[in-house]
Design a protein with these regions (language model features):
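C-terminal catalytic "cap/lid" subdomain
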Residues: 1-136
Length: 136
């Protein structure tokens, strides 16, 4: 990954895939495993000392009251606001919460960082502050 970055390449990684195996005796056997993509993405971003962590998902923005009549999309959140909303249970435990947790862990590990959550289609707009949810 560092080699690709040093060659000015955009690296898209930590998307899961692969077949987990474990050694049993002299054989490799399939193993049940889940790769938490959001967590791994955040860890990689910390390891390479990235300035921005972008998490791509199927919604353009993080929302409060998601799926309800009073749903409120957020274009920006502070770390403190994200923590507060997480404590209030605003984020689905198997959908948005892991993304928020990964973003918060990344942001707290360095200075002058931001995390962006959006869709692949809006990624370029999000980098330019015109789409998605930015957490700083």
């Amino acid at each position: 990954i560092r080699t690709l970055m040093d060659a000015d390449q955009i690296v898209i990684s930590c998307g899961g895939g692969g077949i987990p195996v474990m050694e049993q005796g002299c054989e490799l056997r399939g193993a049940s495993a889940v790769i938490e993509k959001d967590l791994v993405s955040g860890l990689l971003a910390k390891e390479i000392d990235a300035d921005v962590l972008m998490i791509l998902t199927d919604v353009e923005q993080v929302s409060l009251n998601y799926g309800k009549a009073d749903e409120a999309p957020l274009s920006h959140m502070s770390v403190e606001e994200a923590e507060k909303y997480a404590e209030e249970g605003q984020f689905g435990t198997s959908s948005m919460l892991p993304k928020i947790d990964a973003a918060l862990s990344f942001l707290k590990a360095g200075k002058n960082r931001s995390a962006i959550i959006t869709t692949m289609a809006k990624a370029e707009d999000a980098v330019n502050g015109k789409a998605g949810t930015t957490i700083e």
